[in-house]
Amino acid sequence: MAYLFTSESVSEGHPDKVADQISDALIDNFLAFDADSKVACETLVTTGQVILAGEVKSNTYLDVQQIAREVIRKIGYTKSEYMFEANSCGILSAIHEQSADINQGVDRAKPEEQGAGDQGMMFGYATNETENFMPLALDLSHKLLQELAILRRENKEITYLRPDAKSQVTLEYSDDNKPTRIDAIVISTQHDDFDEEAAMLAKIKKDVIEILIPRIIAKNPEHAHLFNDKINYHINPTGKFVIGGPHGDTGLTGRKIIVDTYGGKGAHGGGAFSGKDPSKVDRSAAYATRHIAKNLVAAGVADEILVQVSYAIGVAEPMGIFIETYGTSKVNLTNGEIAKKVEAIFDMRPYFIEQRLKLRNPIYSETAAYGHMGRKPETVTKTFSAPGGNEKTVTVELFTWEKLDFVDQVKTAFGL
């Protein structure tokens, strides 16, 4: 029997994502000047105020206020009527030194013996229902908001958009687990107060259906068949949405972990990513398990794969690796036997994850909105500034965990 599945996303201007982006901008700046920095940075954003708190072990000093303001400015909070504005918001820093008790579990004389920064379990997931091996409902939810942000910055076809927004896509699946159509789309977008409420809501709904949706279809022709005239659109269903962003809702780092990963597909170990340097396995091992799952699916081991890894704090070797193929395996092996082969291909000790995926680089700001997974790997050059005229330009690879660089090795190991 056909069934429905739903995923959501939030925009870069959503309060929780503002917090994530500030935390990850701090991570990038610390790593740019000291690649061995250990950082855990949490951010709270609310009406006219940003609070930074966390633990740091680094040889560099940063102007954290300036970094936070630049992130807020880039997102688009640049008007006083938003009640949260880059130049005028207050910024309080309570960042202090990392505990020596925690650090002793991570630092080792031999780098390869580096212990996990914490206990816990992390999951990676991949499915072949999209070209980027991501669940389709989440992928479309991200793309709706990315395109809405493009329209906001263009300020031509739609001129009233503000930074805060959310989306949700409900797909209908067939008995054989294939997406057949979009059943519903929900979009709530912050906007200027430009007319009477009923007129504003009618205009916004019309623009979403007649401007945003055609642009999504044009950029994603492989999914055009899923769009139809029976889609149930809920556009700003609560009414006008003028008060938004951190003024409308307080935002915190790490509160959008399902948006960041697989939209409710697969599983999640509970640990957030943003604000954590790669010694924190919550982040590095989640990227590594995604890398494994994606390469296994791309190699043809299964149509859908979930990978779990677990750690004890201060211990390099993982407690174990678990594989689930949801009955889609293409190889004559049990899930346990697949896991054994995976262990032989991918070294999951924290140091080797960092080296394999080049994680000790300033690559995290780009992950902090529109999902950490399913993004396109690319090489970029970035410039960072620190007090005293100190400047650093680095060329880095983004989203290395999305590379299909182990497919041949996987095929050889599994005889594919």
UniProtKB/Swiss-Prot annotation:
Record-given protein name: S-adenosylmethionine synthase
Residues reported in the UniProt entry to bind Mg(2+): D16
Gene source species: Flavobacterium johnsoniae (strain ATCC 17061 / DSM 2064 / JCM 8514 / BCRC 14874 / CCUG 350202 / NBRC 14942 / NCIMB 11054 / UW101) (Cytophaga johnsonae)
Cofactor(s) for this UniProt protein: Mg(2+); K(+)
Localization per Swiss-Prot or TrEMBL: Cytoplasm
Protein function: Catalyzes the formation of S-adenosylmethionine (AdoMet) from methionine and ATP. The overall synthetic reaction is composed of two sequential steps, AdoMet formation and the subsequent tripolyphosphate hydrolysis which occurs prior to release of AdoMet from the enzyme.
Keywords in alphabetical order: ATP-binding, Cytoplasm, Magnesium, Metal-binding, Nucleotide-binding, One-carbon metabolism, Potassium, Transferase
GO cellular component: cytoplasm
Cofactor binding, per record: Binds 2 divalent ions per subunit. Binds 1 potassium ion per subunit.
Pathway where this protein functions: Amino-acid biosynthesis; S-adenosyl-L-methionine biosynthesis; S-adenosyl-L-methionine from L-methionine: step 1/1
One Pfam family, short name: S-AdoMet_synt_C
Gene from which the chain derives: metK
Similarity field: Belongs to the AdoMet synthase family.
Annotated binding of L-methionine, by residue: E55, Q98, D249, K280
